[in-house]
């Protein structure tokens, strides 16, 4: 019985680490991009985080690129999981794995297949958990 109590207490303390995080709700402009040299760089199959894109089905990777201010001001980090809403077709869970050009502010880019053309949404909501220490 004591062993079960210890395991249960350990699980509770592990779960409580999520209490040390605060929810960020940020409204951004969202656009799409393709893994092509004209829109990225000469290593279009590798993101800024070093993640290798599934070139046969880039949408399956659920990758977004974020503007620098989302990293520096709002605490977004490479590998973070975010929930995006306000686009309709692209709403859902995405992973921060790429970075946009410094000229963009409060903006995300969805990595999509080349067959998907056009796409710009205003006032897209991103829900993101960040550590309270940032």
Over which residues does each language-model region extend?
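Sec-dependent signal peptide recognition
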Residues: 1-7
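Solvent-exposed, well-ordered loop and adjacent helix/strand elements within mature globular domains
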Residues: 14-134
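Residue-level signal for alpha-helical transmembrane segments in multi-pass membrane proteins
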Residues: 9-13
């Amino acid at each position: 019985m004591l062993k079960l109590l210890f395991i249960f207490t350990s699980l509770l303390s592990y779960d409580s680490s999520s209490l040390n995080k605060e929810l960020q709700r940020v409204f951004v402009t969202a656009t799409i991009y393709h893994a092509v040299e004209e829109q990225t760089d000469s290593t279009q199959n590798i993101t800024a985080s070093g993640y290798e894109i599934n070139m046969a089905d880039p949408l399956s990777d659920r990758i977004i690129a974020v503007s620098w201010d989302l990293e520096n001001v709002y605490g977004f980090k490479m590998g973070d999981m975010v929930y995006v809403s306000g686009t309709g077709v692209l709403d859902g869970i995405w992973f921060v794995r790429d970075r946009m050009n410094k000229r963009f502010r409060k903006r995300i880019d969805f990595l999509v297949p080349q067959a998907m053309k056009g796409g710009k949404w205003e006032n897209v909501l991103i829900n993101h958990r960040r550590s309270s220490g940032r």
